[in-house]
Amino acid sequence: MAGEIPDLIAEARTGTGKGAARQARREGNVPGIVYGGGIDPLAINIPFNVLLKRLKDGRFLSTLFNMKVEGQDDVRVICRNVQRDVVKDLPTHVDFMRLKRTSKIALFIPVEVIGEEECPGLKKGGVLTMVRPEVELRVTAGDIPEQITIDLTGLEIGDTVTISSVELPAGAKATIDRDFVIANLTAPSGLVSAESEEDEDAPAADEVPATEVSEE
C-alpha cells in the first residue's frame, strides 16, 4: 500500500501562454499547471532533471505527491497528463490535479504475478498471457496500492484469472462492473499445432472410415 507521500517541489510561474512556456524550457524547467480543488489554477515550473528522474522511477501517473510551491500552501496532487516532444519523447508540459487524501480517483494499477513455481500449467509448458498488465481501479487518493496480485498456484492450461478471483486492497474497486479476464494460461504453440493436425487427420463426424471387406 502507499506509504509516506513524497514531496514534489515546484515554483510559481509568472506569465502564461506559449511565450512563458518556451522561456521556462530555455531555463531548464518544464512548465505545468495545477488545477482543481475549487480554487484558481496555478501555473508552475518543475526543474527538467527532477521531473525526468521521477518519470524514470515509474508510476508517476499513479503517485500522490505533496506539492511544495514557495508562497503557497502545500497541496496533494496527482499527475493527470504529461505532454512529450514527438521526436525526443521528453516532457514538455505537465498537468496536476489537486486532491484531498480522502478523494476517490480512477488509476491504472500494475498487476504482480506470484505462484509460478506452483503452477502445473506452466510446468507442462503452458504460456501465461497477460491480457491486462494493469487494471483500472477506483481508489482513495491517500491509500493508492502499488500493485494488485494474481496467484497462479494450482492453475492448469486453459484456466483464466478474472478480477473476481483477485483480492483487491481495502477501499479499491474495479471501474468495470463485469468479471473481466486479467490473464490466461494457454497451450504452447507446438502443442496447439499438433492437436490441429490430429483433428485434420481424423474422419469427420458424418464420415464412415473405410474398412477392408473380405470376399466369401
From Swiss-Prot:
One Gene Ontology BP term is: translation
What is the disulfide pattern of this chain? Answer: none
The region called Disordered is annotated at 191-216
GO cellular component term of the entry, any: cytosolic large ribosomal subunit
According to the UniProt entry, its GO molecular function terms are:
5S rRNA binding; structural constituent of ribosome
Keywords from the named record: Ribonucleoprotein, Ribosomal protein, RNA-binding, rRNA-binding
| Composition skew (Acidic residues), residue ranges | 195-204
Q: Which one Pfam family would you cite for this protein?
A: Ribosomal_L25p
Specify the superkingdom.
Bacteria
Listed under subunit, the entry gives: Part of the 50S ribosomal subunit; part of the 5S rRNA/L5/L18/L25 subcomplex. Contacts the 5S rRNA. Binds to the 5S rRNA independently of L5 and L18.
Described by its record, this protein's role is as follows: This is one of the proteins that binds to the 5S RNA in the ribosome where it forms part of the central protuberance.
The similarity comment for this entry is: Belongs to the bacterial ribosomal protein bL25 family. CTC subfamily.
Q: What is this protein called?
A: Large ribosomal subunit protein bL25
Provide the taxonomic classification. Answer: Bacteria, Pseudomonadati, Pseudomonadota, Alphaproteobacteria, Rhodobacterales
